[in-house]
Regions:
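Extended interfacial segments that mediate partner engagement and assembly in macromolecular machines
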Residues: 3-5, 19-119, 132, 136-137, ...
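Short cysteine clusters
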Residues: 9, 15-18
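Nucleotide donor/acceptor-binding cores
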Residues: 60, 139-141, 238-239
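Short, acidic/hydrophobic/Gly-rich beta-strand patch recurrent on exposed beta strands
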Residues: 77-80, 144-146, 275
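Polybasic, low-complexity RNA-engagement segments
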Residues: 84-85, 138, 147, 268
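Short helix/loop segment immediately N-terminal to the Walker
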Residues: 117-124, 241
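Short, aliphatic-rich beta-strand segments
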Residues: 132, 139-148, 206-210, 310
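Rossmann-like S-adenosyl-L-methionine
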Residues: 154-385
Length: 385
């Protein structure tokens, strides 16, 4: 545990993003440890949660909604909890400082270029959101301008003005989201400056990150989490590993140096494209990535009699489902490593696996999201003899 005093955030009661901000960091870790034990303790000993030395400004991905207040002023920030009311934010205590500064600059440029924020009620306006990713080690910066349609007045001059104030920006992309949806990004993008992606170092590897691809938002704790997961995988260099819900291939590529073969499965085409590029960039010749539903893929492996020694899964907050978990047990790996961002759905899924031939041997919580209620956990399971 670490003894970091609570810092007062002026937006804590309005924003709702940092549910535990009123507690000292040490108190937050104690609370999360108790939650992990309550939900997962029936499966075995829960290790002490791994916290951060500096639990502030850790988010390398920042996205801001844009709108107009009652005085007609352009504002940007986050949606208030359970609403689409924008809480203006210029400097968030958990977001990357440079990313916040870029968003403030964009907000200031809109009036000069006569670009209006999009209004959900009237359907008028242009700019819906801005997304910024910044490489913690590489320093590369990706800026995504999310618009309601393809028209962005003076887009080239706008980008030029933005770069004058922030010359460290690596690439700028316009993403078009014309749908009536709560999703931030739409299906179509146009690169306005740079390569359309950034690269970031994680451990000894380099990864490509495009606008729509999933990538962990806390780089410091991601390394801790992945090294824990690989330790739990127990690789000797002879194993076939399946990396389910593989995203941009980070865990699978991490595992590639200690495995005979790695198979990554992901249903997001953009993420798979990045994963393939990442494997090539890191000379991971023993890794193959497939665009497919993970359940269908594993069921296909089982029907074909193909074997995997280790399956690593890192599903979304909703967890896995019985269809996927039954496919895991059908393939029958000796070890399963479950990386979870939701201990409630993790407990549900561990219940299924322990009823179908597996037992839990290690449970390690990691604090990926300080000041929030979220808990990341790595769990090791082995097949019963």
């Amino acid at each position: 545990m670490t003894n970091t005093p609570a810092r007062a955030c002026p937006l804590a009661k309005k924003c709702g993003g940092c549910q535990l901000q009123n507690l000292s960091y040490d108190e937050q870790l104690h609370l999360k440890q108790a939650t992990a034990i309550r939900l997962l303790g029936r499966f075995g000993h829960v290790e002490e949660i791994i916290g951060m030395k500096d639990p502030y400004h850790y988010r390398n991905k920042v996205q801001a909604a844009f709108g107009v207040n009652r005085q007609g002023q352009i504002i940007s920030g986050v949606y208030q909890s359970a609403s689409h009311r924008i809480v203006p934010v210029s400097d968030c205590m958990i977001e990357d400082t440079v990313a916040d500064q870029i968003i403030v600059t964009i907000r200031g440029l809109l009036k000069s270029f006569k670009i209006r924020p999009y209004d959900e009620d009237t359907g008028r306006g242009t700019l819906r959101h801005v997304l910024v990713r910044r490489g913690w080690r590489s320093g590369e910066i990706l800026v995504v301008l999310v618009t309601a349609h393809g028209m962005l007045p003076g887009k080239r001059n706008f980008v030029r003005a933005l770069l004058q104030q922030h010359p460290d920006i690596t690439t700028v992309v316009q993403n078009i989201n014309a749908g009536q949806t709560s999703l931030v990004l739409g299906p179509h993008s146009e690169v306005l400056y740079g390569p359309g992606y950034i690269r970031e170092q994680l451990g000894d590897f380099t990864f490509r990150i495009s606008p729509r691809a999933f990538y962990q938002i806390n780089p410091v704790q991601t390394e801790v989490l992945y090294r824990t997961a690989l330790d739990y995988a127990g690789l000797t260099g002879k194993e076939t590993v399946v990396d389910a819900y593989c995203g941009t291939g980070t865990i699978g590529i991490f595992a590639s140096r200690n495995a005979a073969r790695v198979i990554g499965v992901e249903n997001n085409r953009d993420a798979v494209r990045d994963a393939i590029s990442n494997a090539k960039a890191n000379c991971a010749d023993n890794v193959r990535f497939y665009t497919a539903d993970a359940s269908d893929f594993l069921q296909g492996m089982a029907k074909a009699g193909e074997h995997a020694d280790v399956i690593i899964l890192d599903p979304p907050r909703a967890g896995s489902d019985e269809r996927f978990l039954s496919a895991v047990t059908a393939v029958g790996p000796e070890r399963v490593v479950y990386v979870s961002c939701n201990p409630e759905t993790l407990a549900r899924d561990l219940g299924y696996l322990t009823r179908h031939g597996y037992r839990v041997t290690r449970i390690q919580p990691v604090d990926m999201f300080p000041h929030t209620e979220h808990i990341e956990t790595a769990v090791a399971l082995v097949k019963n003899p």
